[in-house]
Amino acid sequence: MNSTFADQVITFNKNLQYTGALPEGFDVLNPYLDNPETMDVMKKFYHKYYNDSNKRKFIIGINPSRHGAGVTGVPFTDTKRLESICGIKMKSAHTHEVSSVFMYDMIAEYGGPEMFYKEIYINSPFPLAIVRKTKNGWLNANYYDDKKLFEAVKDFMIDSLKKHISLNLDTSEVFILGKKNAGFISKLNKEAQLFDTMTVLEHPRYIQQYKSKEKQLYIDKYILALKK
């Protein structure tokens, strides 16, 4: 029996680990190792929405946040929306994440999670949460925040993107969240020739925090780009 899209994503997540070097002051969190329930809810999510072998469009985030995919194992999905929209309850954690709010408002207008996830797969080039040590404790970090950090994780990111593509993703056009992210993905693409066209969309966190009055405009922009 051929394995489904869901089976392959679950296998990818199960085997996910970063063993490379990191510059001082950075660390990587692996939600699947830190909380056994994360593995359970992630499996439920992919079995629910990805139990087929359809080709899908690929949306690329940055890296999981501690409160979104860093808890649920599902990109741009906090526990609130995992339960209220996807019907999957998480008992060991309760999180609210601004990016998740925008993403699920957009998904609702796209046609709902069944339709959206049937056609689209979201993940990150660095699929684990990165944190940075500050005097106030550990805070979220992006893979591109530090030149040494990017150089350290670059090969791992190319390898991860290739694994995502092998799930059966459409590489003729890829959708990248965040302009700065797109600049770095473009560097990886030059080196590894992964995608033909790169379409850049504003990052959900940026929209929620700085452009909330124009949110509908951005929802329309996403849907227009993804449905064309």
Regions found by a protein language model. Give the residues of each.
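Cofactor-binding loop segments of dinucleotide-utilizing enzymes, especially the Rossmann-like FAD-
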Residues: 62, 179, 203
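Short, flexible loop segments at boundaries between secondary-structure elements
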Residues: 191-227
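An amphipathic alpha-helical core segment
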Residues: 179-193
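A polyanion-binding, active-site-adjacent surface
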Residues: 2-173, 182-186, 209, 217-228
